[in-house]
Amino acid sequence: MDGNYRENKQKWAKKDVIMQRNDRKNSIQPKGQDACDVVGLVDDLLKKAVSLAASDIHFEPTSSGIVVKYRLDGVLNTVEKLPRSLADNIVARLKVLGGLLTYRNDIPQEGRIQLQDEYDGKVLDRRLAIYPTIHGQRAVVRLFYEESGLDKLSQLGFSPYIYSALEQIARQNQGVLLLTGPAGSGKSTTLAALLRHILRCFPGKSVVAIEDPVERHIDGVTQVQITPHGEMTFPTALRSLLRQDPEVLMIGEIRDAETARIVIEAGLTGHLMFSTMHSGTPAGALLRLLEMGIEPYQVTSSVTAVLNQRLVRKLCDKCKKPNPQTQLFEANGCGECFEAGFRGRVLIAELVQLDGYLRQAVLAKADLDELEDILKNRGHMNLCQDGMRLVREGTTTEEELNKVCG
């Protein structure tokens, strides 16, 4: 194999990969590369993604080739542009690694990439998704890592108020805690930390988790993986597990009215329930339950609190600098952060606990604006206000906060 790939393989240090964002140079491969070359290319792309702690690898087909991007700290960065002659072979190699049908190019496919762990033992899972487009097949690999240093609830970065409230919720014997936020906002990490907290503080409790799929193994928790298109669905698994004498249940996601009804009823009958919902705000989550057909009195009787969270990029500690006018820190850029000015992400969150005022509003079927007004008048600290705490501390910037909260 000749051409730029050999050169790139030698140059591909961490900084070189990311600096291509600012100095974009197409590293187009020559035609006629054999299968071994593509195997090495894909292997190197996967290795480099892990070395940079990328959360996702995108292989995006275009009219002229295939573009490879890494998602780093929530932001997509182009790292390679490869010729069209390699596109099919690259996707075919990914399919082989994921155990997918290499001869079907016209259907979406999903799988898991199995690799030796000599270079990325910290990776727990690699999920592969293939999708046909007008320019060819698009592939995305999502990487799941061992979350060193994030095992405990106290390590996640919650404000003292939210941390204390979550500790109190974990002590309860029944009720429902809902988590909201987009994909990649740390909900699974928070749920895992909550379960570990309960097991440490209250050993001997029966703790069960129903997930799609199981993302990380938690010692002491009975974990069940559902099959959405088979017989083991969320409602089926949940109904059966309630007869297994559980005390604490974590349900990966409330996706439908049937699951919502079972979760709410379980929260009223001596079970502590944790789950997630698709909603942008805590008030929106409460209304979503009503839209699913849950009676207002059931919502107010079972739901203890709603936790809404996001992740924002964290300023690089090595190069951040204060603005003389605002006395707030700004991004700068250095070798440690690959000239981005940011390194890692940090949690921002808001927690709404159902008090008498909010319960009365839900029972009265108040709309979203009315619920938001009640929270504001009650002095609720919303997501952006929690984020400003981190801006003042010099952990992130107002601009980054606005990207997430805006």
Residue ranges and their predicted role:
Residues R6, W12-R21, K25-G406:
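Short, flexible helix-loop junctions that flank or precede catalytic/ligand sites
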